[in-house]
């Protein structure tokens, strides 16, 4: 069977979708949007999309045959059958207005993902933290077991060189986004809930009980024969278990977990541990990821694979050979600078719990290194809502360079900006943070901060990821200093 024939065969899963020929994405450059677009391109649809700037996602989609527009305009939706919108897109976007005027259906990203999942065996991974890593680990195990899954991930799976892939099997493994409650569109066979914390609370009217109930509703989207895989170590998830009217498999370090981790040891960038499962032999494992939080992510993947009768050999091999995900404790190299050797790591975590987990992983793996963090807060609302948590967590590094908040389209909030956060950390008295008003100044500041043996951790969900790559290209800013 040729590749084209394989894709044509997949399209017959949803015969009515054959009426749809051209699909347009507004905000196509995001990882989640781009991933779905890539799957649809490979299924044979004519895909177009727009974004405010070119990036690696748009370049890849263009190379696959998608038509990419830089900038938003009403003419971009001419002749399309459906428009898919990102949650980041405002209602007054000209393409949205034009689609409404032309009576073109407008759907959210999760609705399109739900259509891809409708006639497949869907595995949907939800939770405040760990979604991308857990989804990537599950996809890697299924790939190792030759299940050839389709996957849509919110980060670059290094082994595949992409964050999305169209497989030939019935499996679809994807992240489920709770940020706008759109994960309620999904109808999976297996759900994973890694943890539940207060985040994206504007979606839930500031009501944490509503957030918890929405997660229960998400798990009740399972058929009666489906399985909810949940982390029993998380106190909120544990509290919700009696409310879940489906089969539940628990995982964690807790003694009552169905899939339990024992004998955890971190060795640099890797972790070793033993897995105990009910009715199964214990497994001795190594996962090529640092930190106790990544052992939990691994347990979730192991629980899903075990429920699907995947061989232990495939699980062990996939975890040991896992090549990581872009911007998830991504080691960008060691650099010999005039001040000495510095190790550079890039990480996407932007919630206090995620930042703390990254700090703990760095401390456990490299206890002798001084930890220098360049942190860029993400969204004014998150900074406001979790302000004291950020002050406490960011005070735990050895040296802090604090950037201004990455707005992500939000209006600045007085008292929730980078300067205010820097001032509060200074008043706490554990360290003297350095405030950087614009990202471009980071490369000029670091040469005066770094010393031999440091671990430099670039942390955040905004454009600090691009800054970390620039740092790697300029020898952590020293090359710029020498050229001036």
Swiss-Prot record:
Q: Which GO terms describe its molecular function?
A: ATP binding; UDP-N-acetylmuramate-L-alanine ligase activity
What InterPro entries does the database record attribute to this sequence?
A: Mur-like_cat_sf (IPR036565), Mur_ligase_C (IPR004101), Mur_ligase_C_dom_sf (IPR036615), Mur_ligase_cen (IPR013221), Mur_ligase_N (IPR000713), MurCDEF_pg_biosynth (IPR050061), UDP-N-AcMur_Ala_ligase_MurC (IPR005758)
Q: Where in the cell is it found?
A: Cytoplasm
Tell me what reaction this enzyme catalyses. UDP-N-acetyl-alpha-D-muramate + L-alanine + ATP = UDP-N-acetyl-alpha-D-muramoyl-L-alanine + ADP + phosphate + H(+)
Binding residues for ATP: 127-133
User: Pathway, according to UniProt?
Assistant: Cell wall biogenesis; peptidoglycan biosynthesis
The keyword ATP-binding appears for this protein: yes
Tell me the GO BP annotations in alphabetical order. cell division; cell wall organization; peptidoglycan biosynthetic process; regulation of cell shape
Swiss-Prot/TrEMBL keywords: ATP-binding, Cell cycle, Cell division, Cell shape, Cell wall biogenesis/degradation, Cytoplasm, Ligase, Nucleotide-binding, Peptidoglycan synthesis
Hydrolase among keywords: no
User: Which Gene Ontology cellular component terms are annotated?
Assistant: cytoplasm
Q: Check the record and name the Gene3D superfamilies matching this protein.
A: Mur ligase, C-terminal domain (3.90.190.20), Mur-like, catalytic domain (3.40.1190.10), NAD(P)-binding Rossmann-like Domain (3.40.50.720)
Look at the named UniProt entry and state the broad enzyme category this protein falls under. ligase
What is this enzyme's EC?
Answer: 6.3.2.8
Function, as annotated, reads:
Cell wall formation.
Q: Its family?
A: Belongs to the MurCDEF family.
Q: What is this protein called?
A: UDP-N-acetylmuramate--L-alanine ligase
| Source organism (scientific name) | Shewanella amazonensis (strain ATCC BAA-1098 / SB2B)
């Amino acid at each position: 069977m040729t590749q084209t024939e394989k894709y044509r065969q997949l399209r017959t899963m949803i015969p009515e979708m054959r009426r749809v020929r051209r699909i347009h994405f507004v905000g196509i450059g995001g990882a989640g949007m781009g991933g779905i677009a890539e799957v649809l391109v490979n299924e044979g649809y004519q895909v177009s999309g727009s974004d405010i700037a070119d990036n690696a996602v748009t370049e890849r989609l263009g190379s696959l045959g998608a038509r990419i527009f830089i900038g938003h305009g009403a003419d971009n939706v001419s002749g399309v059958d459906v428009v898919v919108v990102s949650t980041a897109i405002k209602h007054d976007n000209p393409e949205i207005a034009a689609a409404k005027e032309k009576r073109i259906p407008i759907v959210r990203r999760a609705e399109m993902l739900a259509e891809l999942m409708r006639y497949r065996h869907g595995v949907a991974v939800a939770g405040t933290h760990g979604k991308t890593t857990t989804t990537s680990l599950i996809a890697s195990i299924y790939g190792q077991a030759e299940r050839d899954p389709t996957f849509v991930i919110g980060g670059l799976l290094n082994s595949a060189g992409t964050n999305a892939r169209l497989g030939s099997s019935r499996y679809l493994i994807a992240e489920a986004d709770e940020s706008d409650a759109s994960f309620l569109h999904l109808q999976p066979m297996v759900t994973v809930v890694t943890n539940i914390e207060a985040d994206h609370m504007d979606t839930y009217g500031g009501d944490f009980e509503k957030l918890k109930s929405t997660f229960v509703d998400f798990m009740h989207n399972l058929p009666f024969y489906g399985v909810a895989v949940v982390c029993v170590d998380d106190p909120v998830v544990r509290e919700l278990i009696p409310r879940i009217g489906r089969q539940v498999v628990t995982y964690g370090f807790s003694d009552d977990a169905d899939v339990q981790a024992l004998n955890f040891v971190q060795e640099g960038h890797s972790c070793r541990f033993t897995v105990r499962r009910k009715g199964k032999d214990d497994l001795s494992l190594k996962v090529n990821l640092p930190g106790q939080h990544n052992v939990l992510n691994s347990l979730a993947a192991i629980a899903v694979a075990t429920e699907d009768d995947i061989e232990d050999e495939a699980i062990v091999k996939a975890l040991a050979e896992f090549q990581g995900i872009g911007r998830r404790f991504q080691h960008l190299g060691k650099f010999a600078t005039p001040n000495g050797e510095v190790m550079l790591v890039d990480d996407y975590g932007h919630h206090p719990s995620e930042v703390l987990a990254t700090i703990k992983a760095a401390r456990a793996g490299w206890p002798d290194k001084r930890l220098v963090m360049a942190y860029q807060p993400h969204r004014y609302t998150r900074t406001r809502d979790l302000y004291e948590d950020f002050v406490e967590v960011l005070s735990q590094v050895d040296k802090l360079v604090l950037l201004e908040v990455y707005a992500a389209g939000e209006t600045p909030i007085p008292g929730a900006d980078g300067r205010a956060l820097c001032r509060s950390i200074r008043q706490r008295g554990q360290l003297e943070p350095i405030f950087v008003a614009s990202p471009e100044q980071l490369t000029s500041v670091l040469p005066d901060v770094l010393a031999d043996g440091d671990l430099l951790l670039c942390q955040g969900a905004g454009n600090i990821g691009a800054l970390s790559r620039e740092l790697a290209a300029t020898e952590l800013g020293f090359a710029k200093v020498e050229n001036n």
